């Protein structure tokens, strides 16, 4: 169980980084366009 949770945590962190990258860029462009 410990190893499975560790792998899931790593996968979740990787997915979060992968999704957060474009999301931050989108927010920056959106705010720049809004301003």
Curated annotation (Swiss-Prot):
Name the InterPro entries on file. PSII_Ycf12_core-subunit (IPR010284)
Q: Does the record carry Ribosomal protein as a key word?
A: no
Question: According to its record, how does it sit in the membrane?
Answer: Single-pass membrane protein
Whether Transmembrane helix counts among this entry's keywords is yes
> GO cellular component annotations, sorted alphabetically?
organellar chromatophore thylakoid membrane; photosystem II; plastid
Tell me where the signal peptide lies. none
Q: Which UniProt keywords apply?
A: Membrane, Organellar chromatophore, Photosynthesis, Photosystem II, Plastid, Thylakoid, Transmembrane, Transmembrane helix
Q: Which GO terms describe its biological process?
A: photosynthesis
Q: Which residues form a coiled coil?
A: none
From the Swiss-Prot or TrEMBL record, state where the protein is found. Answer: Plastid, Organellar chromatophore thylakoid membrane
What residue intervals traverse the membrane? 7-27
Q: Which domain of life is it from?
A: Eukaryota
Any idea what job this protein has? A core subunit of photosystem II (PSII), probably helps stabilize the reaction center.
Family label: Belongs to the Psb30/Ycf12 family.
Against NCBIfam families, the record matches this protein to:
PRK13686.1 (NF010239)
Q: How does it assemble?
A: PSII is composed of 1 copy each of membrane proteins PsbA, PsbB, PsbC, PsbD, PsbE, PsbF, PsbH, PsbI, PsbJ, PsbK, PsbL, PsbM, PsbT, PsbX, PsbY, PsbZ, Psb30/Ycf12, peripheral proteins of the oxygen-evolving complex and a large number of cofactors. It forms dimeric complexes.
Q: What name does UniProt use for this protein?
A: Photosystem II reaction center protein Psb30
Task: Identify the species of origin.
Answer: Paulinella chromatophora
Gene this protein is translated from: psb30
């Amino acid at each position: 169980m410990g190893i499975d949770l560790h792998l899931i945590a790593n996968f979740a962190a990787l997915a979060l980084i992968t999704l957060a990258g474009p999301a931050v860029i989108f927010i920056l462009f959106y705010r720049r366009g809004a301003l």
